[in-house]
């Protein structure tokens, strides 16, 4: 296949078509759980699950094919679990934002992220958004995911007196299945079993079919994809997303995307040996832009923001070095469109372990905090803690920025403050002080 070898630089990167196909299948198995988890999470917020399933498959399929063809990168794109949680539980449920407005915010985030990925604005933002705050946001979102998953199965429930939450019914079937599932995922991932998360979801679903009367198989396996009567396709309210109260949400989405995408893409590129002599990502600009364009797809199709999946590392570990890996992933997600009935068979307690596991992985950001910079590290932890305590990502980020600026001034370390950081902090605090934040 000389054309493929030349187009995707197979020989130059030390790979083969067969190796790339195996890598693509490996990545797909590692992240296909998203087409089950994302509709379940957004469905809890009132999104029509059938429409979200199709949109999620389309975003993952088209986004992965785009980054494979354009950036020649072995990275797969899908709806980010952390941003799905933010969209569903913080934005729509917690802050009562209408679903079309939420989709408008997702689309606007995609527009802004695309612009900053193709101009010098991204470099300015990266210079002025402290890494400790970014890592703190990652920790907070991880804790938020853990809380959402634990609450969803009844492990943690609201408390009528005293502290806000308490232990639920520990012996209930959903709780026991979730905890067993989490332990299984951790064990399988330790053993580097490909598709471990998916296999656990399937196993718990089968157990549910046998022992849980609420889980029923309708007899269908294949179904022609249709958005359904309650389709969210092109239902975004872009003008609604431009309201002052919604703009902090867009900022939070953009900030998370900037740091998460850059960190994930760099990590995967490093594993695939796709860094140049200066340590920069080969075709990094195209990869980041592909990532941001995929969030435009999300807003248009009606699902959560997109991002490069860290599970792409499973494929690069299997030998993926070119865009063929990503294209294989994209094609497989498009084929998933025809297996919709199987996705809706999965109970919430089967996907909860996956959410808990992703949340635990995000807590690894603690190791990235620079504790030699005491004020910065504490500001990052303030950001993390208040994201979960307020169930609001933007609030945590605002408090983190405010603590950083005030802490620098009080400690006499004002020289470490960038003008841009101060501007961002003032804008965020003003949004809250003015009552415009949601």
Curated annotation (Swiss-Prot):
Keywords: ATP-binding, Cell membrane, Membrane, Nucleotide-binding, Transmembrane, Transmembrane helix, Transport. One of its GO terms (molecular function) is guanine transmembrane transporter activity. It is a multi-pass membrane protein. The chain crosses the membrane at residues 21-41, 51-71, 73-93, 97-117, 137-157, 167-187, 195-215, 238-258, 296-316, 326-346, 347-367, 386-406, 418-438. InterPro entries: Azg-like, NCS2. Pfam families: Xan_ur_permease. This is Putative permease HI_0125. It comes from Haemophilus influenzae (strain ATCC 51907 / DSM 11121 / KW20 / Rd). The lineage of its organism: Bacteria, Pseudomonadati, Pseudomonadota, Gammaproteobacteria, Pasteurellales.
């Amino acid at each position: 296949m000389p054309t493929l070898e030349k187009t995707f630089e197979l020989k130059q990167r030390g790979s083969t078509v067969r190796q790339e196909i195996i890598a693509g299948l490996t990545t797909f198995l590692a992240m296909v759980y998203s087409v089950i988890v994302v509709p379940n999470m957004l469905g809890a917020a009132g999104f029509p699950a059938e429409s979200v399933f199709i949109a999620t498959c389309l975003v993952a399929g088209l986004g992965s094919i785009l980054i494979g063809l354009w950036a020649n990168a072995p990275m797969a794109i899908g709806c980010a679990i952390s941003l799905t949680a933010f969209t569903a539980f913080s934005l729509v449920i917690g802050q009562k934002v209408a679903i079309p407005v939420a989709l408008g915010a997702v689309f606007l985030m995609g527009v802004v992220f695309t612009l900053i990925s193709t101009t010098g604005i991204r470099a300015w933002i990266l210079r002025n958004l402290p890494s400790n705050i970014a890592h703190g946001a990652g920790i907070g979102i991880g804790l938020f995911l853990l809380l959402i998953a634990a609450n969803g199965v009844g492990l943690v429930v609201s408390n009528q007196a005293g502290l806000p939450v308490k232990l639920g019914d520990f012996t209930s079937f959903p709780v026991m299945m979730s905890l067993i599932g989490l332990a299984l995922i951790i064990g399988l991932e330790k053993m580097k079993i490909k598709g471990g998360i998916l296999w656990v979801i399937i196993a718990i679903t089968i157990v549910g079919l046998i022992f849980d009367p609420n889980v029923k198989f309708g007899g269908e396996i294949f179904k022609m994809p249709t958005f359904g009567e309650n389709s969210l396709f092109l239902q975004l309210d872009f003008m609604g997303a431009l309201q002052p109260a919604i703009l902090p949400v867009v900022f939070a989405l953009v900030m998370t995307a900037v740091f998460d995408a850059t960190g994930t893409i760099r990590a995967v590129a490093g594993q695939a040996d796709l860094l140049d002599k200066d340590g920069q990502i080969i075709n990094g600009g195209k990869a980041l832009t592909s990532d941001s364009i995929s969030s435009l797809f999300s807003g248009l199709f009606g699902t959560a923001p997109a991002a490069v999946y860290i599970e792409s590392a499973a494929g690069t570990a299997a030998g993926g070095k070119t865009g063929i890996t990503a294209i294989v992933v994209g094609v497989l997600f498009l084929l998933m469109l025809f297996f919709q009935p199987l996705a809706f068979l999965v109970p919430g307690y089967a996907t909860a372990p996956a959410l808990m596991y992703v949340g635990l992985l995000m807590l690894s950001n603690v190791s990235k905090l620079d504790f030699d910079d005491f004020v910065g590290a504490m500001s990052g932890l303030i950001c993390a803690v208040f994201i979960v305590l307020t169930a609001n990502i933007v609030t945590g980020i605002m408090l983190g920025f405010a603590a950083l600026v005030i802490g620098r001034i009080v400690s006499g370390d004002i020289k470490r403050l960038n003008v841009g950081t101060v501007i961002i902090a003032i804008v965020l605090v003003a949004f809250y002080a003015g009552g415009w934040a949601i």
